[in-house]
């Protein structure tokens, strides 16, 4: 997969990066205080990765060697976890030495979906590196 800076959706050190699908209200906002971090931002699902469904966006902080996999989802949290895993599988070799973080931004999830056993296992495995944010 080509994670070259020229294909990034943002400049090298933007003040903020917004991951948002066209026509949707869900979005993930990352703030770059004082523009001190070198960032790259890619749309994965359907753009860089077309052979299977995966998470929507990848945000890379080259300064801290952190990679954020981002899924914007309505209500199917279990599917969102699978899409994060697929995104990681495709990006892992290109980002050796980077620590992965996982973000789900959802708008219609019910408590029992967030408490699903597959979601809990993922949360137990990644701890504080995994976050779900509900938007309304």
Q: Predicted segment positions?
A:
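Active-site metal-binding core of divalent-cation-utilizing nuclease and nuclease-like domains
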Residues: 24-62, 79
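Active-site-adjacent loop/helix micro-motif of nuclease/hydrolase catalytic cores
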Residues: 49-50, 76-84, 112-115
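Domain-level recognition of nuclease-like catalytic cores that cleave nucleotide substrates
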Residues: 1-9, 101-136
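Short beta-strand-loop-alpha-helix junction that forms the active-site gateway
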Residues: 71-78, 108
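Conserved catalytic cores of phosphodiester-cleaving nucleases, focusing on short active-site segments
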Residues: 57-59, 66-74
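Solvent-exposed, charged helical/coil patches
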Residues: 1-36
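Histidine-anchored nucleotide/phosphate-binding helix
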Residues: 82-95
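Short conserved catalytic/interaction loops centered on acidic-Pro-aromatic/His motifs
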Residues: 95-101
């Amino acid at each position: 997969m080509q994670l070259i800076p020229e294909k990034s959706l943002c400049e090298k050190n933007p003040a903020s990066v917004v991951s948002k699908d066209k026509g949707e209200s869900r979005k993930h906002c990352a703030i770059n205080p004082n523009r001190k971090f070198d960032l790259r931002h890619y749309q994965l699902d359907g753009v860089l990765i077309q052979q299977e469904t995966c998470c929507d966006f990848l945000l890379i902080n080259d300064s801290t060697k952190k990679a954020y996999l981002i899924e914007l989802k309505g209500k199917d949290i279990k599917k969102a976890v699978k899409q994060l895993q697929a995104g990681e599988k495709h990006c892992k070799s290109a980002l050796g030495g980077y620590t992965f973080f996982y973000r789900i931004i959802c708008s219609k999830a019910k408590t029992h979906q967030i408490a699903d056993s597959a979601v809990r296992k993922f949360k137990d495995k990644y701890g504080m590196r995994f976050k779900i944010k509900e938007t309304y």
